[in-house]
């Protein structure tokens, strides 16, 4: 799945609200988590702690840094450093990912100005409408995007395209997407890779049309991913699990027969579980009645929670059963790219009682000012909507600790991340836990044949939300968490 861009220096969220390189003066700087840097250095004595870093608030975790001496090319959309030819034109990773998500999710944006906003590295996130408009005007080819939403274009040789102003207007208004949907619905959906298959999830509950289309794209991607693997010959080291390649034969109307879990599947899941720290979070979250929590205090608490959760992910890496199979460089690269997703996944599952219980009680004692409410960005509103939807999905599924451990490993072993030295080995490890998770869910939840794809479809959503949260200005995070936690806790109590 495509990863979202990191926020540009000084860039803000949507809706024209300004972003910050550091917390504003009203907020205390987050606590440094230098211990995380030391912990990662311990993974390989040869590093001597000499690593570049990516900030978490003001803390650091190691990350590989591209060579500045590489040839500099400019993105035709925003002027940032280009990384290659993407969908027909030279562009950066950020605009590439933005264009792909906009087309795959059939997004329809609005411009609050005159539809001529400046596109630059610092301002590209302020107006999604004008950003997509410039992508189309500069010749980005939406037909080069794979219809299943998976990485890799359909035809890398396709160059920029020239389309009429009328067609651009149809795309920007969403009319083009509606016409395509009607076309495919009238021509059947026998091909998993066709857009018509996306209509199959239209009757699923979702908080809005954007989430519904996103869910259908993810299901289509899941089907293509599954078919790719199921059509392959079974590798020798996977043949010990005979049930793994029978998923395509399952019918929602005819649950599979009960069977036993393969001993080696059980063993690998047990090893994953042994790596997990399921003890309650140690960060104090209890506040006396009647105390009014300030924005600065809530922000500091969120930073301490993020520090503890990040520390647990680093400790988890060192206990993984495949720890010796990958290089330290790859582990550093993987953690730098997925730490937000790992924290979000754990917060929605194994630590959800504390996050949506104790932390929700703290956020309830925080009252945002009128200015904070007025300045809240559209980007933050989208994150809120998707987080609430994802919370209810996890609450409905009641994800077990074993499923959580498998999902976490699958998400972490993302071979599409740039800078990896062992992508093929990562792919094999990813498949291993993909199959084991499928084996476990089919064994334990015999009468829920759709459970495994439902679990897997949560992972792209987590990646998308984690990427979007990076673009939310820091001073808006206390309000964001207050709204999400209040909504989720209130709806759960009503149930």
Swiss-Prot record:
Chain segments carrying region Sufficient for interaction with UIMC1: 187-268
Primary location recorded for the protein, binned into one broad class: nucleus
Stretch list, region Disordered: 1-34, 145-165, 177-214
Gly residues composition-biased segments: 9-18
First and last residues of each zinc finger (NR C4-type): 75-95, 111-135
Tissue: Expressed in the germ cells of both the adult testis and ovary, being most abundant in spermatids.
Alphabetized GO MF terms: DNA-binding transcription activator activity, RNA polymerase II-specific; DNA-binding transcription repressor activity; protein homodimerization activity; RNA polymerase II cis-regulatory region sequence-specific DNA binding; sequence-specific DNA binding; zinc ion binding
Pfam families membership: Hormone_recep, zf-C4
GO cellular component, one term: nucleus
Binding site residues for Zn(2+) 1: 75, 78, 92, 95
Positions contributing to Zn(2+) 2 binding: 111, 117, 127, 130
Locations listed in the record: Nucleus
Bias-annotated ranges (Low complexity): 202-214
Positions of the NR LBD domain: 264-495
Family: Belongs to the nuclear hormone receptor family. NR6 subfamily.
Quaternary assembly: Homodimer. Interacts with UIMC1.
Function: Orphan nuclear receptor that binds to a response element containing the sequence 5'-TCAAGGTCA-3'. Acts as a regulator of embryonic stem cell pluripotency by mediating repression of POU5F1/OCT4: binds to the DR0 element within the POU5F1/OCT4 promoter and inhibits POU5F1/OCT4 expression during embryonic stem cell differentiation. Required to restrict POU5F1/OCT4 expression to the germ cell lineage. Involved in the regulation of gene expression in germ cell development during gametogenesis.
UniProt protein name: Nuclear receptor subfamily 6 group A member 1
Organism: Mus musculus
